[in-house]
Structures are given as structure tokens and as C-alpha cells.
Amino acid sequence: MIEYLSKKISRVNLNNQKANRGGVLVKTHHGWEDKMEPLVAITFQIIQSQFTRTANDYLPGESGLTSTSMVIGKAVARLISREPIKLEHQLTIGDLFIEGFVYHGFAELIPPTRRDESYILKATPKWEELADIPLDIVKETILGSYKEPQPINKNMHKMHDYLYDPEAPYVVAVKNLQNVSWSINTSVLDKVIAPPSELEENDAKEQRRRSKVIEHRFITAKAEVLKEWDCFYQSFEIDYRGRIYNTEPFLNYQSSDMAKGLLLFSDPKPINESGKFWLAVHTAACYNQSYNINDIPEWCEEDYKSHLEEEGLEDISVDKMTLNDRVGWTMANWDKVFSCELDLKAEKPYMFLASCYEWDFVERTGMTQLPVAIDGSNNGWQHLGAISKDAHTGELVGLVPSIIQKDFYVQTAKCLIDLASKDERLTSLLQSMPMKHIRKGISKRGSMTRAYSAGASKIAENMYFDVRAEEFTDKYGITRKDCDKLAKLLVKAIDQVCPGPLQTMAYLQELAQFQIGKHELIGGTRAEFKRLKDRRRELLSKGELDDDELAELNDVSIQINSFKYELTYGNGETTIEWDTPSGFRARYENFTTVDFKARARLNGKDVKHVLKTPTDRPNIRGFMSGISPNFIHSMDAAHMALVIADWDGAFGAVHDSFATHASDVDDLLQKTKQVFIEMYTNDNFFDTIRQQLTNNTDSVEQPALGELDVGDINDSEYFFC
């Protein structure tokens, strides 16, 4: 590939006005030939990052060609000292380097499915071969792991033109995470198997299979390198909401089952009885066996049959049982545990295998080094429930004590079924499906994302993908039109089940609307303004103008300048900022955009670049739809950061899942509860929100608070578990 790109660049005629502009910019850099290896490596890193950190619009293994090309162009321009660089030149450079990967069959170009959208860059099965790219070329740029703890990236320190406080909890949290030492679980690595190589006929399943193939190759290649190190450290970054992410895109604790199964804390600790309890809970949850209502095991202490009948369910999975019964599962399956075999029937086969090896390690040494996690129960809804003090929501998401864990997705599914009763087709469809399939294919993802303001159209899109992946389209005849209808009803169902969170989201939207404000066009109607602008554009496009046309152009320009946008409501700000409990200053921007379009030729194929570039005018609709998810994400980020900052043990960080040594889980759970309660003990958190988001205190009416006592979390077994 390096040879191909080098030849292509060397053939560029610098005197030809029509020559590839990207090639010209690279070729005119002195010593460009010597930089081709790192330039190709950084291109690979960016494409891989785009494939793994995809936006909601793209599946794993896909990315937008325009956005990917732009990022590559910026990075290459920086390395060849060509910054600042115009957008169109960024794209020509990016296209040049992407072509190398397309030409050699590592990626392919897919036309957009809708007008005015970017081409899609998609990994081919051959992409996995790039895991063999030499380590001395890529160094840490794709590995993201180091032999020594790394200092915090300086770019993270100066956020939005203000200096960070080195003692702020979010800064301390990042430092603590970067001081956690890891090692590779070589026992698990030895039993890693490749995903199936046969192509799937189902498009959704094939996309998942291809993603797993790519993931497998990269994770194992990196693990083979890191297993030779006694320990390694990883670096982290913070986004604009304060959320903490691994910079390594694959082999990290925020990644997949395989990645987590391969990771151990490098420093073992003595295990105690509490540690054995939590290791048993963890082991059972990783396997997560399901039992039919008529086959509940004798070792279960609770009456799950009555519970299932009440919920309309036919099965219960171990992760919905009490903690004691999860331990009971592990005790009843010692033969399975001590066989230490990869069992693909497990929900998380590699994490289960790692827990099996951990039991062997515990028996032999009395020590433990496996990360054992406690997971939040629908974490977004937990924060919304705590803010609104909605007791009913609290019951569904573990803020209130209960004997058997409530299933949030089942509750929304049951309400959905009631709402669909007037639609004969939907009623027949839902009656043909067992509740577990309604929960998995129809209710789950939509109920999860609604907490972050997902609308019916996005929920329908995700729902249709899920039912295709589960083959429910064939089994039950579910169509895209059905998903559109079901998504609208699901939104209503969720809003009925969780009225407090709904009011909280609406309140956040109203505050955002007031803070940004409303501007009206003064001087005439929008139609008149548009007509004048169109006429000026028409006159300017003519080239030479006669005297009458020049006079008209001058008059039109004067009329256009007489139009003004004036603030008629609210504060008229262009951004919304707030300080989170961790000391992080979140800054949310959402500007109107204009379309940028450009034609290009890539690997002999005509493509169209489409990009929305921001203006300097705030997008009030964008602010209103985005404020709730961004605010809630900033709160879950603050919760985790406050826990980590006050934690002196090892920590595996996922936004709603915290891991540590088994012996320390009790202490971590107590710390997790304590921090959350302290965040929301405020009698009226709506006051805090209003003070943070806007300097106005009277114009937006607060919702009524519910009766939830967040202190009840102390007695809840299912808050994090």
C-alpha cells in the first residue's frame, strides 16, 4: 500500500492545474517519501477508530466517507506542516490515502441510501489482515497501551478556554484510571476462537459477523504483544460532557466480552468471603442461563414462578434472580466452572471463561485479580428518576428496595401491548410473540435510548434492525411499517410508565429554549428576504452588469441589510454550559448548518462528498432535543468520576458499570451508593438545574416533585449489582 501511494504521489505533475490536489500538497512537502509509513499508519488508525466508534447512523465496520476523509486530511496536513488547510483540500488528501485501502481491497465504497448523504466506507473481510501491521510502524498510535502510566493529555487540561483544576474530581479520576495496571489473561487468550467465516444471508447478522471478525483479529494481535509485558497501562480522554473514554479502540475494559475476558488487574489481592460471594455473582451473570417457568431449579430460594406469571413471562434469566440465587447457580454448576472450557452457550463466553480460571486461581493461591463488575440498573432512568423523585420509576430501576429485581423493559412492553389494543394487526402480531421476544426485539433498545431523548423515528430504525438480526421479521412477519407504528406507541408507553423523567426532560428542553432564546426576522417576511437574496445571487452570477442591473444590485443589497434578527424571547446565548458535581464544565453547542457538497474521484469511481458545516447561528430545535441526553450523560459521568476520585483500589471503568477486585466490591458498592445519594439529596434538584443552565429564575415553571427518598438506595440490592 505504501508503494502504491508513493508511486501515485510521485507521478503527480506539479505544473498541471488539474492534478490531484491532495497529491500536490503531499509531494511539495520536503521529505514526503520518508513520512509515508507514519502517514499510512495514521490513516489506518483513523479509519479503524471511525469503524469502532461509529455514530448512530453507521453500523460497526462502517463510517461516513466524507467525515473520515476530512479527519484523515487534517491529520496528514498536520504531519506535513500544511495547516491550516481548506475543507476541500482536507478531503482531497483524505481521499488519496483512503484510496490505498480501497484499491487493495481492505475497504469498499457503498453509495448512500438517501439523497444528500455521504458515501459509506465499509470494511471488507480482508480488513482483519491489517491487524498484522508492524508494531514498529504504528507504535502506540493504535495500541493505546503503555509500559508506564501516562500523564493526562494536555489537550484535556484546557477545556473551552478555561484552565482545569488539577485537584478537581474528574481530573483525579482520570489520573487514577491511568495508574491502574493491567495484564493479559493468557489462559483465556489460549482458548480464543475465531468467529464463523461463513457469510450470513441475513444482512444484519452478516454485519455483526463481519464486525466480530475484525474485532477478533485486532484484539488477539494486540493481546499477543501485551502478554509479554508484566503489566501495562492505558490512557483516557474526556468528552465535552465529562464522560471518560479509553483512547484504545478495542482492547480495553469498555469494549466487548472478548476484550474484558482477556484483561486482568496485574496486582492480585487476597480474597475474603465477601470476595467469593461477588465472584460467584459475577460468574453466574456472565453465563446467565435462562430457566422456563416450569423448570425453576430446586436451589432457588425465591418463588419465581409466581413472579413470572404476574409479569406474563415464560422464562427467567439468572441475572434477574436475587444475588443469593446467583451464588446458588454458581454453587450448583461447579463442574461447569472447574472444567474451564469456552462455552459458547454462555451469554458472555470469554468473561465466563475468565471467571472459571479465576476460581482455579483462588483455590490455588487464595488471591484474586479478575475485575468483578457491578452494573447500574437502567442508569439513565436512575438519574432521571432521582432528579424528579419519581417513586414509580425508582421501583423499576433499583432506587427502591425490592425482593426480586423489576424488569423495566417488561413494564414498558406491557404498557405497549395495552396501547396497541386498538390496532388489529399490531394486536395480532404482539399476541403471536412471547413476552421475552417482545422485550428483546421491540421494547429493550427503545426503552433504553428514550432516557436520552431518542425519538420515534430513531427507535423505529433501531427496532427494525434488531428484529431482523433476531430473525423476527421471518418468524412473526414484522415489517418496517410495523416498527414505525410500534415505536410511536412505545414512546407513549414509556412516558406513561415514567411520568417524572418525562417531565424532567421537558423541563430541560424549556430551559434550553429560554437560554438560547428566540430570534425573529425584523424588516419583512421570510419569503421577501429569501426572494431578495435569490435575486442578488442571480445578479452576481451574471458577471458584467449594465447600469440598471448595478443600480438594482445596490438597491437589493440595501434592502437585504435592512432585515435584522432580533431577540424576542429568552437570553439569546449561543451555548449552554453547566458545572457538573465532579468539577467538570460541560459545554453544549448546536449550530444550524449549511450543506457542503463536492464531487471527487476515488479509485476510478465518481463519489460525492456531503457534509453539514456549522454556521454561527444556534439551532434551537437541536438544543432542545439534545439537552436532556447531554445533561444526563454529564451526570452519569460525574457520578463515576466522583467514585473513582475517592477510590484507592483498581478500577475498570464503563459509564454505568464499575469493576474492581472481588474482595473490594462491597466497599465499591457502598461508595457508589453514597456518591449517588449525595448528588441527589438536594430537596429540589430542579433548582440546581435552573441555576446551572440559565441565569433566569422565573420564566420556566418547574415540574412537581415526586415522593422518592433517594436514601432508600442504601437498602436496595439492585441499584448497582
For every predicted segment, state its role.
Residues 235, 650, 657:
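Short, surface-exposed charged micro-motifs
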Residues 508, 652, 659-662:
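Short glycine-rich phosphate-binding loop at a beta-alpha junction
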Residues 659-672:
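Catalytic palm subdomain of template-directed nucleic-acid polymerases
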Residues 245-246, 656-660:
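Short cationic amphipathic helices and targeting signals
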Residues 636-654:
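Active-site palm subdomain of RNA-directed nucleic acid polymerases
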Residues 459, 640, 656-658:
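Hydrophobic, well-ordered secondary-structure elements that form the walls
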Residues 1-447, 451-631, 646, 669-670, ...:
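Non-catalytic nucleic-acid-binding interfaces of large nucleic-acid enzymes and RNP effectors
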